[in-house]
Amino acid sequence: MSDQSFDAPVWHNGKALRKGYTTGSCATAAAKVAALMVLRQHLIHQVSIVTPSGVTLCLNVESPHIEGRQAIAAIRKDGGDDVDATHGMLIFARVTLNDSGEITLQGGEGVGTVTRKGIGLPVGSAAINRTPRHTIESVVREAIGPARGADIEIFAPEGEERAQKTYNARLGILGGISIIGTTGIVTPMSEESWKRSLSLELEIKRAAGLERVVLVPGNHGERFVREQMGIDTQVVVTMSNFVGYMIEEAVRLGYRHIVLIGHPGKLIKIAAGIFHTHSHIADARMETLVAHLALLGAPLELLTRVSDCDTTEAAMEHIEAYGFQHIYNHLAQRICMRVMQMLRFTKTPPTCDAIMFSFDNQILGSNRPIEEIVEEMQC
């Protein structure tokens, strides 16, 4: 990525969105300027780094301080127009020179601690991902030369509070934020970043020994599983709209049993072979309902009424009025069939089940008896 491409906006829904930079870039820049300040013994107010994607960032330095062989500096996180929980916070680095020739890196206040396997970092270590670790150590080594040593501490005073608005606790990262970023650049509305964060939860649960997983579109699905089905939320992972991607990730990681649970408004699309359920990709909810109602012998009047509906909930009212609620079991079976078709080239595909529920938390249908599915998920 060139500097010009960094300055160029990302267009989304007709709006120009500004790119930003990651906590990893902030920590790298803060560590570099702290190392330079302790060597030169004077304050520096601007620093440049080259991100892993090749973009050069020129960043303002805040709170610079030198005390003997130690210096502290901070960089303010700017997520561009992809405002997240860490946007606007200060990421600090403290660099202390020594004569060991070695560089050490640790997390301080506000940087989370890894408590579970599965994210590529040792349990007990600071949540500073591999790419930022490399860039932080590299810029400090370049600054101090081959003979000197340095102890680096990355800290973020607001980190513990900000982390409560992130997925960190679910990923087993406690006490603060993560220092992350494989490219160093934040791209607004980045689907790949979102998908990767969801997949990471699958990896952590698999590393903990989980072989069965419930995939839900969002918070409503998770609540339903916990409150109405009595299934431990430890087996629940959000898939958002990325149904196909998350199923493939679960297969890659070796899960043996996948259960899809959600409202028909999302899951119906899977019955039509649509594995990315965002409306900007595809809809076909009413068409799918009409087709399967017709297969079940529904009268033309019901088909017409459903076809004219704008929402799944409205269609469901007509389906209930005509006594065709058994369509949900039929659709759940169709969903599982579609999943197995998608995985037809997989050597050992997992078992797949599907359950649909209404907005008022009533179970509408499933591909096989609910009791069997729940019992297996509790094993």
Swiss-Prot record:
Q: Which domain of life is it from?
A: Bacteria
Q: Which reaction does it catalyse?
A: Co-precorrin-5B + S-adenosyl-L-methionine = Co-precorrin-6A + S-adenosyl-L-homocysteine
Alphabetical UniProt keywords:
Cobalamin biosynthesis, Methyltransferase, S-adenosyl-L-methionine, Transferase
Task: State the Gene Ontology terms under molecular function.
Answer: cobalt-precorrin-5B C1-methyltransferase activity
- Pathway assigned to this chain's UniProt record: Cofactor biosynthesis; adenosylcobalamin biosynthesis; cob(II)yrinate a,c-diamide from sirohydrochlorin (anaerobic route): step 6/10
Q: Belongs to which family?
A: Belongs to the CbiD family.
Pfam families registered for this protein in UniProt: CbiD
Q: What is this protein called?
A: Cobalt-precorrin-5B C(1)-methyltransferase
